């Protein structure tokens, strides 16, 4: 019997909506990354994007454990000498709550063109409203 390999044109992708309110950042991000890769499907193939679309709502209500609200620091660099910037979790969640979840999930995906395609299927919104109701996303609980 031959080994099954998923073809990109035959992969069926579903839409799911995840409520991040009260969820722990790392635990939620690992589940989302696994779903984006398609590892929950029997037809998972490492070199084919078999994952689903994930819509995350209420990103502003995500929580972290311990003292990470003040101690967790996000870095960015402009590319120029001395151009490093840092912001802690507390300030970033107030400024751009979507970036917290996006950064956590992106770090758990492959660092190659396939990983970038997987990342594009992640949609994160700060509030409870999202523009993807036409896709009829199913609710996903972790």
Curated annotation (Swiss-Prot):
Domain of life: Bacteria
PROSITE patterns: RIBOSOMAL_L13
Gene Ontology BP annotations: negative regulation of translation; translation
Keyword set, alphabetical order: Ribonucleoprotein, Ribosomal protein
InterPro entries attached to this UniProt entry: Ribosomal_uL13 (IPR005822), Ribosomal_uL13_bac-type (IPR005823), Ribosomal_uL13_CS (IPR023563), Ribosomal_uL13_sf (IPR036899)
HAMAP family cross-referenced by the UniProt entry: Ribosomal_uL13
Family: Belongs to the universal ribosomal protein uL13 family.
Protein role: This protein is one of the early assembly proteins of the 50S ribosomal subunit, although it is not seen to bind rRNA by itself. It is important during the early stages of 50S assembly.
Name of the featured protein: Large ribosomal subunit protein uL13
Organism field: Pseudomonas syringae pv. tomato (strain ATCC BAA-871 / DC3000)
Organismal lineage: Bacteria, Pseudomonadati, Pseudomonadota, Gammaproteobacteria, Pseudomonadales
Encoding gene per record: rplM
